[in-house]
């Protein structure tokens, strides 16, 4: 990237980084075969996913704005992929909607399966590598009625769904993600009550659900490899940078360690080593080791943690309080999250200890100001480049998101897209930041 094109903020960022670390080589080149692209998820873009638990949650008035038609991506995927191709993307992450494949228990919608086959063929025809998520937060209403993630049989139902999908779609997909952000799902659904099933402070149930999610991942891992031995199978792990609310307070520093382990390492460590542990609290051996071929990293921001006692909930910090964002030191995005690029390199280095490839499966900013999007993107890619230069095996970067979409409880106010969507007309417009990202992709270098 020509230095003359850099904004004042970018220059300041680069200067700050260079002052505290060895300089990054000019015109840093990313590895050959690096995956460049963006990501979406079914419920957030397809529209009218009427058979899942999130649709029921919305219709019950649990969110201010329901998903409705979303981006109508179900009908517009080809033209959306044309835009991705025009931007030079060589990879695209999306999810298959379980409730479309199996809208009623044991009843398979072959039309939906064929639709996703056409999605995969459309990507392949455009030279775009699919990265497919099997479970991105939503489940069929019938599964939710059985107890959802609290039902010990869910791994069996997920495996049956995966077998049906792999039987038809397996030849077209090498990269698979079993679960998206399982720990976030547990926090939002069983501790904060903000997402289905709407439990609050249900710590014992939350730990049970985490175990079931781990077992489900293992079952899915083996199903995928049975159909496609050369598959690359991982999860998308939400990585949340954490700092103590008061660095002088020992209890806050300890809470950062506990919450950091629970949120950022517990799931991956368990799948890699077979040990489910929280230091000083519990340890359990599970038959789940060595079931990650890569680690997907979703990274957005940093939180500040204040200890609120010496129970597990207290050690994690006040997970229900908005104070986590009160003391942010950096620039805030439209959802009040701090822009903290250093955290991405931190996690790339931390996760490299597992000695398996890392794919950045989400990284983006909700903002109406596209200049901020470009600065965010550049600063985070700078951190990726620095980590790779230090020897981290990072194989790709997928920006969140390709298009503006339905952002769960935040509705449509969070504009993450490289491509702007007018939700009244469904018109698309490529943002300037997307073209600047395209130039990095074209050159495969910063």
Task: For the regions a language model picked out, list residue spans one by one.
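Active-site region of glycoside hydrolase catalytic domains
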Residues: 2-61, 85, 105, 114-373, ...
């Amino acid at each position: 990237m020509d230095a003359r094109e850099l904004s004042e903020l970018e220059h300041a960022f680069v200067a700050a980084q260079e002052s505290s670390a060895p300089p990054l080589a000019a015109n840093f080149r990313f590895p050959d075969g690096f995956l460049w692209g963006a990501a979406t998820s079914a419920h957030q873009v397809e529209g009218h996913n009427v058979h899942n638990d999130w649709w029921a949650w919305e219709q019950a008035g649990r969110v201010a704005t329901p998903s409705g038609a979303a981006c109508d991506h179900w009908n517009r995927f080809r033209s959306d992929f044309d835009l991705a191709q025009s931007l030079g993307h060589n990879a695209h992450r999306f999810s298959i909607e379980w409730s479309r494949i199996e809208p009623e228990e044991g009843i398979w919608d072959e039309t939906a399966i064929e639709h996703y086959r056409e999605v995969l063929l459309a990507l392949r025809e455009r030279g775009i590598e699919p990265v497919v998520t099997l479970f991105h937060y939503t489940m069929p209403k019938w599964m939710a009625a059985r107890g959802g993630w609290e039902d010990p049989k869910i791994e069996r139902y997920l495996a049956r769904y995966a077998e049906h999908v792999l039987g038809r779609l397996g030849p077209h997909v090498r990269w698979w993600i079993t679960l998206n952000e399982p720990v976030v799902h547990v926090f939002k659904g069983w501790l904060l009550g903000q997402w289905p099933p709407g439990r609050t402070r249900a710590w014992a149930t939350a730990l049970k659900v985490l175990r079931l999610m781990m077992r489900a991942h293992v079952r899915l891992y083996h199903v995928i490899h049975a159909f496609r031995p050369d598959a690359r199978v991982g999860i998308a792990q939400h990585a949340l940078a954490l700092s103590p609310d008061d660095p002088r307070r020992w209890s806050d520093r300890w809470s950062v360690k506990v919450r950091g382990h629970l949120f950022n390492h517990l799931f991956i460590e368990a799948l890699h080593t077979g040990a489910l542990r929280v230091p000083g609290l519990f340890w359990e051996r599970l038959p789940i080791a060595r079931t990650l071929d890569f680690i997907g990293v979703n990274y957005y921001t940093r939180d500040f943690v204040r200890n609120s006692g010496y129970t597990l909930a207290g050690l994690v910090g006040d997970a229900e309080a908005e104070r986590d964002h009160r003391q942010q030191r950096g620039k805030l995005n439209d959802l009040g999250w701090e822009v903290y690029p250093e955290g991405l390199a931190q996690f790339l280095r931390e996760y490299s200890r597992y000695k398996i490839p890392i794919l950045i499966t989400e990284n983006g900013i909700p903002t109406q100001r596209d200049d901020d999007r470009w600065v965010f993107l550049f600063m985070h890619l700078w951190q990726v480049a620095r980590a790779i230069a230090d020897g981290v095996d990072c194989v790709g970067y997928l920006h969140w998101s390709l298009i503006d979409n339905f952002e769960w409880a935040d509705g449509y106010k969070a504009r993450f897209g490289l491509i702007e969507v007018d939700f009244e007309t469904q018109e698309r417009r490529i943002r300037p930041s997307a073209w600047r990202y395209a130039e990095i992709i074209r050159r495969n270098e910063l």
